[in-house]
């Protein structure tokens, strides 16, 4: 009982100071923080107590020896020299966990093999049978660490990692290990808050790990109480009477703690996550103590009779598009915490620390942590008591502008039945955004494009303004954060603007006049529907009856749909992108138009296609729409393209394909574009830019340029 051992509790990096504090509370004398763990000298009972009670540790290791080692033979000899017969019972199995390397030992599997060989040969040398290896569930798990020219050998008393409490089967969304979750709660001050009778709420609880760990803490239930198998269970040095005494004490404390009444609540809007949380709650034996409910972030509200802790582990977002979407989520989270949780303690655990600025909260403490290899931060803050959410002068001005724009557009929107429109377009210099509203068949969405700030602008100020803007937009449009889709507009090169920024595959349907279109608000910079050409498409639909229609640089084929619905005799849709041609096909089918001989889709480089068709099929089309990009140097194109430089050739080739009484509608978006004088002289040209700029783009009359061209 009084024999002292070298002991080590491993933990996630960043939790070492908290683990020192926890072990000290468990009676450990002079615990010392080391990298990814805490060391101490103590008796066997202190090690067993740590196995049973530590919420933050991942493993408890009992050290046997530390010796200099240079090569594989040294590994073998160090292992063979230890009296393994004092630790491994005859006929029992073993496994070796090896960590580290040097110039001679480069692979952990090889290192583990040499240590195992030393152990096996030692057992045979003292007359015991050769032990077998069982990597899944060994009777004795040996821990070997090679670092700094020294080999540390020990026994893993925990066996399976201590984070496995037994209640979590499926991870759900971005699973958080139980010991790291407990560490977050410890750092956020939950033990003190629970002692004072405060509640715990996770408004984005996922599979419920944070709430369940908080419940185990508050109810004084040892995290290892439900575990049957331990690393010391078959260890020859195990003293069962010590373990029984510790378990009996833990059961008494759990019974006493179970009489406490606290509000322990988790919300999530994902029904699958809530189902997982409920299953985990059942396995944890906390059915009557923890409440999980499907609820949106905007509906989250305080629980219990006293201020408590609201703790959140939002999604991390690995791709650019996901990170941009999280800006909206963080802004909405901060707004909800400020508006509804005054007097509470708050904590947000983020795998993208730069997003914490979008909370708009004054952070009292930041803790740098590692979730596996990922650098993370826990931000802790005290939420001030306040009435209505106070906005900055700039945010108030933005809200006023949105209201003004809506009032100006309301009558037109109602009269024309417009379901997708631009509400705001950089009207205020400090809020350089474009805001488009989509009234889809399944509800309202906001598509927000931030124009990238110049380097001279302070990044934190820019993040603050964006956060304010997103809050104002969501509140004005009365939509939740999942319906505000943020993009960042940077200077695009070549086909960059058409490359995906995310891969959700989510689509919605929006109405435009007689047509219905699929839009994607997340995966690309653009949505599949250029709103500034709404009038142009409607005019094409009116002009198409009985005509042969050609749509060049067709994008998602929206103009083709209008032409087909308008009674076009036939249509052909040409674009280089297979993605957008597939989208065009879906748009046709959505409107009851069957692609085929009458409505052809052709994947081709429009420049090469025009050059080939102009000579072979003159006068083939009665109505042509051509809306080329400003610039392109796509590797799939036979040549680079600049609309100012190349539009004369492009127009002349298109005019060769136009019937004598036909109409070519040419448009482009290049700022400062001017139509070639020779083209204007050779054809009957009429600029219709003003006629095709809709009221929602009146503030930006140069969003596109548009002409009608006919043969003279």
UniProtKB/Swiss-Prot annotation:
Its EC number is 2.1.1.173, 2.1.1.264. It comes from the Bacteria. GO terms for cellular component: cytoplasm. It catalyses: guanosine(2445) in 23S rRNA + S-adenosyl-L-methionine = N(2)-methylguanosine(2445) in 23S rRNA + S-adenosyl-L-homocysteine + H(+); guanosine(2069) in 23S rRNA + S-adenosyl-L-methionine = N(2)-methylguanosine(2069) in 23S rRNA + S-adenosyl-L-homocysteine + H(+). It is found in: Cytoplasm. Signal peptide: none annotated. Residues 46-157 form the THUMP domain. InterPro entries: 23SrRNA_methyltr_KL, DNA_methylase_N6_adenine_CS, RlmKL-like_Mtase, RlmKL-like_Mtase_CS, RlmL_1st, SAM-dep_methyl-trfase, SAM-dependent_MTases_sf, THUMP_dom. It holds the Pfam family THUMP. One of its GO terms (molecular function) is RNA binding. Its main location: cytoplasm. PROSITE patterns: THUMP, UPF0020. Specifically methylates the guanine in position 2445 (m2G2445) and the guanine in position 2069 (m7G2069) of 23S rRNA. Belongs to the methyltransferase superfamily. RlmKL family. HAMAP family: 23SrRNA_methyltr_KL. This is Ribosomal RNA large subunit methyltransferase K/L. The lineage of its organism: Bacteria, Pseudomonadati, Pseudomonadota, Gammaproteobacteria, Chromatiales.
